[in-house]
Design a protein with these regions (language model features):
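Adenylate-forming
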Residues: 22-27, 145-189
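Flexible, low-complexity linker/hinge segments
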Residues: 36-59
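ATP-dependent adenylate-forming carboxylate-activation enzymes
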Residues: 1-10, 24-26, 124-145, 155-156, ...
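Conserved AMP-binding A3 loop
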Residues: 60-87
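Conserved ATP-binding loop and adjacent catalytic segment of the adenylate-forming AMP-binding
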Residues: 127-129, 150, 188, 192-198
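Conserved AMP-binding/adenylation subdomain of ANL enzymes
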Residues: 83-100, 110-149
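Conserved S/T- and glycine-rich ATP-binding loop of Class I adenylate-forming
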Residues: 59, 65-68, 101, 107, ...
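Phosphate-coordination loops involved in phosphoryl transfer and adenosine-cofactor binding
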Residues: 56, 97-98, 172
Length: 198
């Protein structure tokens, strides 16, 4: 997700976030934010104690979404929103501490973040990777770590349909899908691919 620098600066001025996770160099060095963690090409920045101003004590997160218009918007989520959503998904999917998932969606995407939240909440395992689903190393890691659940949008499943002629890793127990309607032919093909190793 690319964001205009002027727009980003304005968001920071308005919301004064305690933490910012961004690409290195996206936020110019200043006295308000210090880098506390570096991972590959990303930085986690923490706001210094100066000028901390609480806008809304319930506000936890601003998530970017393009919605139906294609123009970026930010949705405010409270601690209660995130907590309720996390617990409802856990209850519905029966996610347990023994579960193992893999990052296949961007963490800046609501669905990708909910996969992280739900698994962390129950003490499950999350396999973090920068490998793309089209890389053999992604599927090797999937098998080696015995990943048992996978989350994706229709595009992820269209990739699986194209590259998984031999079937999916035998450790896979279930998948979840969001982010748009999947056509019936793709659903049928994914089920058939899943059955090959069962």
């Amino acid at each position: 997700f690319r964001i205009n620098e002027i727009f980003l600066k304005r968001l920071i001025q308005i919301y004064k976030p305690s933490y910012i996770y961004c690409a290195k160099g996206k936020i110019k060095k200043n006295n308000l934010y210090n880098s506390i963690l570096k991972y590959k090409s990303y930085n986690l920045l923490k706001r210094s104690n100066e000028e901390i101003e609480i806008i809304n004590k319930d506000l936890m997160l601003l998530m970017s979404t393009s919605g139906t218009t294609g123009s970026p918007k930010f949705v405010r989520q409270s601690y209660l929103n995130v907590s309720s959503n996390t617990q409802n998904i856990i209850k519905y999917l029966k996610i347990k501490s023994k579960d193992i998932t893999i990052t296949s969606l961007p963490l800046t995407y609501v669905y990708g973040l909910s996969v992280i939240n739900t698994h962390l909440f129950v003490g499950a395992t999350i396999v973090l990777t920068n490998y793309s689903m089209v890389e053999k190393k992604f599927w090797d890691l999937f098998s080696t770590c015995k990943v048992n659940n996978f989350s994706g949008v229709p595009y992820n499943y269209s990739i699986i349909e194209k590259i998984s002629k031999k079937g999916l890793p035998s450790s896979l127990e279930y998948t979840t899908q969001a982010g748009g309607k999947m056509n019936h032919v793709l659903i049928k093909n994914i089920i058939n691919i899943y059955k090959k190793n069962k």
